Structures are given as structure tokens and as C-alpha cells.
Amino acid sequence: MSRAVAQAAETASTFRDANEQLEARADELGLGARPTPYLCECEDGRCTELIALTRVEYEEVRAYPKRFVVVAGHQEADARIVQEAPRFTVVEKIGEEGKLVAARDPRAR
């Protein structure tokens, strides 16, 4: 496995972990169906863009451990696009990167 693949998986997983904490906080605050700001889960470790998602939209992505939500246009060229919406794109990691992110899924721990 290349270092670039491992780094990409690490970066996306780190953003996903942060979003899981945001999700827990949204639940504590009782935000209900209102859109919640989530971090873009792209592979750029410097990205700070936010995506407003309903909790249902977020849970639809998180139902699959290899899927990530990114700002539209932030997907990598080799990404498998699962869903495109005006506000966001859902991508699925494949190959070695997919195995790495699935192993780091906080919901599988």
C-alpha cells in the first residue's frame, strides 16, 4: 500500500471522527431535523469547509463505513461517486483505502 493511500484514508477518517462528535453534540442540543454543519470529509487535511446536512442525510452516509460526504467538487478523481447533490457529494472509498477507512469506522469499534 502506498503512503499516499494511507494518508488519504487517515485524513478522511479524521474528519469523519470529528463529524461523529458534532453529531453527538447536535443530539445533545436537540437540533432535531434542522440542518447541522458538518466538516467536509475530503482528503485535503487543510480543508475547513462546512456542509449543512440534516441528520437524516448524515445518517444515510454513515450507514456505510466506506462512504464520506464532501463539498461538491472536493472529490478525488478516482473516487466512486455514490450521490451528487447541489450542496454535497457522497463518495465511497474503494480498494486498500476502503479497507483502511472501514477499519477506522468509529461505529464499528
Question: At which residue positions do the language-model features occur?
Answer:
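Polybasic/polar functional segments that serve as interface/processing modules
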Residues: 1-109
